[in-house]
Regions:
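Carbohydrate-interacting/catalytic domains
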Residues: 2-3, 15-75, 102, 106-108, ...
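Acidic/aromatic-lined carbohydrate-recognition and catalytic surfaces
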Residues: 17-211, 215, 228-294, 422
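C-terminal GPI-anchoring signal of eukaryotic secretory precursors
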Residues: 570-587
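Terminal signal-anchor or tail-anchor transmembrane helices
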Residues: 587-601
Length: 604
C-alpha cells in the first residue's frame, strides 16, 4: 500500500444557463498565429506570402479558427525578419502587393473571420526614411529617435552615454552615428533604433498609421515589445543585477523597461480603436506582447474608465517543460487568474515564433495532452501555426540560420527552429513551396507529419485538435464553472461544470502510469465518466467508461504517461454563441479551498 497526498485548489466560475451574456467576438476566440514566411508560398520563391495565406483560409475555417494574427509583412530590410520596419504603410514585395493585402482582408471577412496584424512601434529599421532624416537633423524628424551625446572622458575622448545594454547584442545599447555626431539608442539590434515617444509629432505619426490600417479593415493589433516603449529621460546608469550574469541580464532595467508612460501610450492607442468602434459598433482588439509578471499584465488591461489593452498575452506555458509537475501547473494557472482585474479576459499561449514548440519541450507523446490542457480553459486560446499537427522544432545548422539572435548573443540557439515551413502534404518540401529550396528547411518528418495525412487519420493530432475545438464551442466550456485539482504529483485535472453536465480534463505529466482516483478529491464528480476525447497514446477510445473512484473489486482507472483524457457526463454536442471568461465583473469567484491536503489510501 502507498499513500498519495493530493493538493486541491478550487476556483469556481458559476453562471446560470439562462443568464448568458452576449460577449464580444474576441472574448473567447481561437486566434491562429501565422508567421507569413512559413505558412504557404504561392509564387515559388521559397518564402510564404499573402496569397499563400488566402489559399489556406478554408483550412483555417475547417479547423474552427475565429481570428488570424499575421506577423509583420511590412516593407523591411529583414535584418530581424520583418521586425525592423522601413515603411509602416506598405507590405514588403516578398509578401505581395497592397492589392494582395486588400484581397486578403476581403477574403478573411468573407469567411466570417477576424484579422489581427502585428504592429512594431518600439523601433523602426535604420533604413526607414524617418531615421535617415533624423540623423540629418531635419524637422520634424530630428527627435523621432532617442539621441544622446556621449559621456566626456577627457578633452579628446567620449564614451557611450550610460551603461544601458542591448537585449540582442548583449553589449552597449548605444551606437555612434557619424552624420549626427551623436549616439542613438537601440534595445534590440543596432539596425533597430528606438523611437522617441516623448516627441508629440512622432506620437501623431503612429496614431495615423493605426488609423490607416483600421480604415483598410483590420480588426485589431498585436503590439510588439510594449515594455520597452519609453525610457527614463535622465539617462542615468542602471543598477547592477546581483543575480545577473552577463549581457542584458547584468542590469536591473529600472530606467528602460515598464516606465509608467508606457501604459499611457497603450491607452492612447486604445482610444484610436474606440474612435472606430463608436462609428460602427464593431470592437477592435488591442493585444500586447507581455513577458512581465502577472501584476504588469493587470496594469496593461486598465479599467472601465481608463481603457487599455483587452489582451496582454499570457505566455506562462511557453516557459514550462518536462520538469513541471501537477502542483506547478496548478499554481501557475491559479496565480494568473487571481491577478486579472474586474474586466480582465484570460488568455493562453504555449507556443510562438520566439520559443520552443511543445513536443520539443515535453516530448512528442505529450502533444494531445497539452492541447487538452490549454484548449478547454476559460477565455482566449492562441494557437501558433502547426500546433494542431504537433509540429516539432527543427535542427537548423549554423549555415542555414536566418535569425539575427542566432548569430549574435545566443550562439547556442536560434529562434529559426520553431519557424520552419508548414507541411501541407508529403510531396517535396511538404507542399509548402514549388521552389527547389524553402527559406528554412522543412522538418524532415514532414513525410508522415503533415496536414493531408493527419486529416485522413481519425486519431491524428489534427483530428483530436478539431474535436477539442468543437467542444470549446459548447455551453459547458463557454459558460461553465471552472475548478482545478492536483490528483497526485504528476496528474493534473480541471473540470468545467454547467448545471448537470461536467467535462473533466485529466493529464499525466509524468513518466509512469498513474491511477486517476479523481473522485477522492472532487467528491461531486460521478464515480464513472465517459471518454469524450482521448489522446492517441492513452489506450482509451471515444465512449469508453473511466472509473474515478476505487470500489470493491473495481480499482480506479489508470492513465499512461504523457497522455490525457477529456471525460464527459453527457454528449456535449450543443453549440453556443457565448463565451466563458475569467472576469470578476460577470462571474462569481469562489475560493472553495485555498489549500487542502488529503491522504488517499490506494491499493497497489
Amino acid at each position: 500500500m502507498r499513500f498519495v497526498h493530493a493538493i486541491v485548489v478550487l476556483i469556481g466560475i458559476t453562471s446560470a444557463s439562462t443568464a448568458f451574456r452576449d460577449l464580444d467576438w474576441y472574448e473567447c476566440m481561437l486566434q491562429y498565429q501565422i508567421y507569413p514566411r512559413s505558412f504557404k508560398d504561392s509564387d515559388g520563391d521559397g518564402i510564404g506570402d499573402l496569397r499563400g495565406i488566402v489559399e489556406k483560409l478554408d483550412y483555417l475555417v475547417d479547423l474552427g479558427v475565429d481570428a488570424i494574427w499575421i506577423q509583420p509583412f511590412y516593407k523591411s530590410p529583414m535584418r530581424d525578419l520583418g521586425y525592423d520596419v522601413s515603411d509602416y504603410r506598405s507590405p514588403d514585395p516578398m509578401f505581395g502587393s497592397m492589392t494582395d493585402l486588400e484581397n486578403l482582408i476581403k477574403a478573411v471577412k468573407e469567411r466570417g473571420l477576424k484579422l489581427v496584424i502585428d504592429f512594431v512601434p518600439n523601433h523602426s529599421s535604420d533604413e526607414h526614411d524617418w531615421f535617415k532624416l533624423s540623423q540629418e537633423g531635419m524637422a520634424p524628424y530630428k527627435d523621432y529617435y532617442v539621441w544622446a551625446d556621449g559621456r566626456i572622458i577627457n578633452e579628446s575622448h567620449t564614451d557611450v552615454p550610460n551603461n544601458w545594454i542591448s537585449l540582442f547584442e548583449g553589449s552597449s545599447a548605444w551606437a555612434w552615428n557619424e552624420k549626427r555626431r551623436q549616439y542613438y539608442y537601440h534595445v534590440f539590434s543596432i539596425k533597430q533604433p528606438d523611437l522617441n515617444y516623448r516627441n508629440r509629432a512622432l506620437r501623431e505619426e503612429i496614431i495615423n498609421i493605426l488609423r490607416f490600417w483600421l480604415k483598410l479593415g483590420v480588426d485589431g493589433f498585436r503590439i510588439d515589445a510594449p515594455g520597452w516603449l519609453m525610457e527614463a529621460p535622465h539617462f542615468r546608469d542602471e543598477p547592477l543585477n546581483p543575480d545577473g550574469d552577463k549581457g542584458f541580464a547584468a542590469l536591473q532595467h529600472v530606467y528602460t523597461m515598464f516606465q509608467e508612460e508606457n501604459f499611457d501610450l497603450i491607452h492612447e492607442w486604445r482610444m484610436v480603436l474606440e474612435e472606430f468602434k463608436n462609428k460602427d459598433g464593431h470592437t477592435r482588439l488591442l493585444s500586447v506582447e507581455d513577458f512581465s509578471v502577472p501584476q504588469f499584465k493587470a496594469r496593461y488591461m486598465g479599467n472601465s474608465t481608463y481603457l487599455m489593452a483587452q489582451m496582454p498575452f499570457n505566455f506562462m506555458f511557453e516557459f514550462k517543460d518536462y520538469e513541471e509537475n501537477a502542483t506547478n501547473i496548478n499554481h501557475s494557472i491559479q496565480s494568473y487568474l487571481k491577478t486579472l482585474p474586474a474586466s480582465g479576459i484570460s488568455n493562453w499561449a504555449s507556443e510562438s515564433h520566439d520559443y520552443t514548440r511543445i513536443p520539443s519541450r515535453f516530448g512528442a507523446e505529450s502533444v494531445d495532452a497539452w492541447n487538452m490542457l490549454q484548449m478547454l480553459l476559460p477565455g482566449i486560446l492562441n494557437v501558433y501555426y502547426g500546433m494542431e499537427l504537433g509540429l516539432e522544432d527543427s535542427f537548423i545548422r549554423q549555415d542555414q540560420r536566418q535569425d539575427h539572435i542566432g548569430r549574435t548573443q545566443f550562439d547556442t540557439t536560434t529562434r529559426d527552429t520553431s519557424r520552419t515551413p508548414m507541411p501541407w502534404d508529403n510531396t517535396k518540401n511538404g507542399g509548402f513551396t514549388t521552389a527547389e529550396k524553402p527559406w528554412l528547411p522543412i522538418h524532415s518528418n514532414y513525410v508522415h507529419k503533415n496536414v493531408k495525412s493527419q486529416l485522413e487519420d481519425p486519431k491524428s493530432h489534427l483530428n483530436t485538435f478539431k474535436r477539442l475545438v468543437k467542444l470549446r464551442k459548447t455551453h459547458v466550456i463557454r459558460h461553465g464553472r471552472f475548478d482545478t485539482y492536483v490528483l497526485s504529483t504528476w496528474v493534473f485535472m480541471y473540470t468545467r461544470t454547467l448545471e448537470s453536465e461536467t467535462i473533466a480534463v485529466i493529464i499525466n505529466l509524468g513518466t509512469e502510469t498513474e491511477q486517476i482516483c479523481a473522485n477522492n478529491v472532487a467528491q461531486t464528480l460521478p464515480g464513472v465518466m465517459t471518454v469524450h476525447t482521448p489522446s492517441r497514446n492513452s489506450g482509451y477510445q471515444i465512449g469508453d467508461e473511466v472509473t474515478l473512484t476505487s470500489l470493491i473489486g473495481r480499482p480506479c482507472s489508470e492513465l499512461r504517461p504523457k497522455s490525457g483524457l477529456v471525460l464527459s457526463t453527457s454528449n456535449a454536442d450543443t453549440y453556443s454563441s457565448g463565451c466563458s471568461i475569467f472576469s470578476n465583473c460577470i462571474i462569481n469567484l469562489i475560493v472553495l479551498a485555498t489549500v487542502m491536503s488529503l491522504s488517499t489510501k490506494i491499493i497497489d
